[in-house]
Amino acid sequence: MPPKKADGVKKARAPAKRKLAEEFPSGEVLTDNAKKKWKLGSAVGQGGFGLLYLANEDSSGPVTADAPYVIKVEPSDNGPLFSELKFYMRAAKPDLIGAWMKSKKMEYLGVPKYWGSGFHEKNGKRYRFMVMDRFGTDLQKLFEGNGKKFSRKLVLQLGLRLLDILEYIHDHEYVHADIKASNLLLSYTNPNQVFLVDYGLAYRYAPEGVPKEYKEDPKRCHDGTIEFTSIDAHKGVSPSRRADLEIMGYCMIQWLCSRLPWEDKLQDPLYVRDSKLRCRDNIDEFLKSCFASGNIPAEMGKFMQEVKVLGYTDRPDYDKLRGILQQGLKSIGSTDDKKLDFGVATNSTSLPSVKTPKRKKAEEKGQSADETDSTPAKKRRAPQKKEVNGAKKTASPAKRPVKKETQASSEPAVKKSRGRPKKNS
């Protein structure tokens, strides 16, 4: 599976087997499968191999700059949007999300709502489209703009929001598999609400409520974004609930300390995998390496320990995990006041900053991951500009083959690190 290139590439370029969507003029009207009409505004970004447009319900007037929706359009024979649609249609309909929120007495849930989809013919070509909520900026921009550090209170609050999101999608048979700051977007109208987007790698881990069994596939090693992806993914195992929580843990630790210990060798996925294996086996040493000052947030160790003991098919105790993060807030004399403060962080000194090497992303094929019993299809994104709804994905060259490890149970044995970076794997 090809790695993912670093951000900042300005010119879009797709692999030969993928087609880029042509740009539609403002005012183009699309009709979804429910016969509802939507009017396109200007193109405001590119996501994967599709274009993003401002949009509104069809009316006599133009689509203005404050339009509440965006529409993603891709050539119909491309795979990424097809796979996202499978998740949205099964798990993100507004009434489904609304019923969950009511049952949990929640003010909001950070899962984007599905508003419609369909096909559109233009110049003899057929396109697939999906209507989504419009969002604001992504957390990666805020993280970098804040010196690559968030306050402890903010990180714990984001963790609580993520647990709400993950419990919902997990209980609706899916896992996300690519949690990271660039996939977390603020609401367009409420800066205290954050949403998890980009379900191109979302995997239906439990069709009809039955979790799939642990199985390694050497051809699918290192799926996801390499610095955050789970140990299971490094070993070619299909995404799971415990994997989502492991990824979430790496994200929270990075937000607190600026970078993870393996971030200077992202070009060597085996080194990254083996580093994570060692860190899982000695969580205390892992956290010491992240927080050089010794001011280690105790809740991070407890959180990672809970994730460590989860079996591949286990249902996480979301309430227990929430309790760990809430106790962390209490230890700093704070509570979850539902207000997200992205101001200057006050965490103690941690690891020195380094330049982040190229990242890696899976290529998603035309078949949806939830349509097969095999490991989820990989995806590759084309480089693009990022404008709206965090629409920025990139492609990378091929990786070297990975040596398969022996698997006796759902908890793989630790292998020694190769310790040597290798170019662009």
UniProtKB/Swiss-Prot annotation:
Q: EC top class, in one word?
A: transferase
Its function, per the record, reads: Serine/threonine kinase involved in the regulation of key cellular processes including the cell cycle, nuclear condensation, transcription regulation, and DNA damage response. Controls chromatin organization and remodeling by mediating phosphorylation of histone H3 on 'Thr-4' and histone H2AX (H2aXT4ph). It also phosphorylates KAT5 in response to DNA damage, promoting KAT5 association with chromatin and histone acetyltransferase activity. Is involved in the regulation of cell cycle progression of neural progenitors, and is required for proper cortical neuronal migration.
Originating organism: Danio rerio (Zebrafish)
GO: which molecular function terms?
A: ATP binding; protein serine kinase activity; protein serine/threonine kinase activity
The EC number of this protein is 2.7.11.1
Q: Which residues form the Protein kinase domain?
A: 38-329
* Family as reported in the entry's similarity comment: Belongs to the protein kinase superfamily. CK1 Ser/Thr protein kinase family. VRK subfamily.
- SMART domains referenced in this protein's UniProt entry, alphabetically: S_TKc (SM00220)
One Pfam family it belongs to: Pkinase
Q: Which GO terms describe its cellular component?
A: Cajal body; cytoplasm; Golgi stack; nucleus
> Which keywords label this protein?
ATP-binding, Cell cycle, Cell division, Cytoplasm, Kinase, Mitosis, Nucleotide-binding, Nucleus, Serine/threonine-protein kinase, Transferase
Cellular compartments annotated: Nucleus; Cytoplasm; Nucleus, Cajal body
Which domain of life does the protein's organism represent? Eukaryota
Recorded catalytic reaction(s): these are: L-seryl-[protein] + ATP = O-phospho-L-seryl-[protein] + ADP + H(+); L-threonyl-[protein] + ATP = O-phospho-L-threonyl-[protein] + ADP + H(+)
Q: What is this protein called?
A: Serine/threonine-protein kinase VRK1
Which positions are catalytic residues? Answer: 178
In which residue ranges is the amino acid composition biased (Basic residues)?
A: 415-425
Q: Where does ATP bind?
A: 44-52, 72
Major subcellular location class: nucleus
Could you provide one GO biological process annotation from this protein's UniProt record? Answer: cell division
Q: Where is the segment annotated Disordered? A: 343-425
